[in-house]
């Protein structure tokens, strides 16, 4: 989720905590990182702490958390901690946290493989990344998607409607949520009009056949009985066609510089078509 400086800060932080703590972070659509503009970074951190979240900043503590949360050999989450509470995970990592801790937030500088906690964690563990502004925030959000989430879900918290549109266009995600908790928003219906589902398509970005939330409709075999029909076939004809004997004399009374003369090849061969053209000062004549 990208948290831009114009957002309603308290709502944005509440949404992220609500989303990431729901079902202990097991919803695949939940945030894996909060990318926060530098202008509001300290204020956002304080708000997270007010929501019983613990900020982990020391490199040694982050390294301990990485070892417990991730299987770095597989660049994937450690299955042993999936769905566990923040307190249980902290204990496994040898970190002391207060009772009632909802989330563990690890401060990392960027969304790259050099910082494994940017990967999908399926737990109440969230990366916290500072951005230098909109462009940097967008790039880091793209980096998050490229770390195994391409085609899935992206979130922006901002009151700037132009940025909402730009973010939606730029992110390679099939669900782009605005000012919403990612887990509850991504699975649909509660915060938007998307189809409620726990199976989310990632489109061609993620090598999926569909890009929407999977529902019972996708399980139906829809038959089509198609009866034969001919497509419309037509051709344009002149508004007037003169065909009786001596009708060529009507050219004296018609204001036209282009006519089509229908005749046999002999009429052309012996020059009669050219004679008509000269006598009536026609600049062009189609001979058929």
Identify the function of each model-found stretch:
Residues 1-112:
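ALDH superfamily catalytic-core signature
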Residues 36, 56-58, 104-106, 177-180, ...:
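General beta-strand structural signal in soluble alpha/beta enzymes
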Residues 37-39, 107-109, 157-159, 263-266:
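Structural motif
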Residues 43-50, 166-170, 271-280:
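Short, aromatic/basic amphipathic alpha-helical patches
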Residues 95-231:
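Conserved C-terminal structural/oligomerization subdomain of aldehyde/semialdehyde dehydrogenase
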């Amino acid at each position: 989720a990208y948290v831009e400086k114009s957002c309603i800060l308290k709502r944005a932080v509440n949404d992220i905590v609500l989303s990431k703590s729901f079902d202990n972070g097991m919803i695949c659509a939940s945030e894996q990182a909060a990318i926060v503009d530098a202008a509001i970074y300290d204020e956002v951190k304080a708000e997270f702490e007010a929501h019983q979240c613990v900020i982990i900043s020391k490199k040694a503590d982050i390294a301990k958390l990485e070892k417990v949360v991730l299987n770095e050999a597989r660049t994937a989450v450690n299955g042993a901690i999936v769905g566990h509470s923040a307190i249980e995970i902290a204990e496994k990592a040898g970190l002391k946290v207060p009772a009632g801790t909802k989330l563990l937030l690890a401060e990392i500088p960027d969304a790259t493989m050099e910082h494994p906690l940017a990967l999908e964690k399926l737990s109440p563990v969230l990366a916290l990344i500072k951005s230098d502004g909109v462009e940097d925030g967008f790039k880091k959000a793209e980096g998050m998607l490229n770390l195994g989430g391409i085609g899935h879900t992206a979130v922006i918290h901002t009151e700037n409607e132009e940025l909402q549109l730009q973010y939606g266009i730029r992110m390679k995600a099939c669900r782009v949520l605005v000012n919403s908790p990612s887990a509850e928003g991504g699975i649909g219906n509660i915060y938007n009009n998307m189809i409620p589902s726990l199976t989310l398509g990632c489109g061609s970005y993620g090598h999926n056949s569909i890009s929407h939330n999977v529902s019972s409709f996708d399980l139906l075999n829809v038959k089509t009985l198609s009866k034969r029909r001919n497509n419309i076939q037509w051709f344009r004809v002149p508004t007037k066609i003169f065909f009786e004997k001596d009708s060529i004399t009507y050219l004296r009374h018609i204001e036209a510089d282009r006519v089509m003369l229908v005749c046999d090849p002999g009429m052309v061969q012996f020059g009669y078509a050219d004679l008509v053209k000269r006598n009536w000062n026609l600049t062009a004549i189609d001979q058929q």
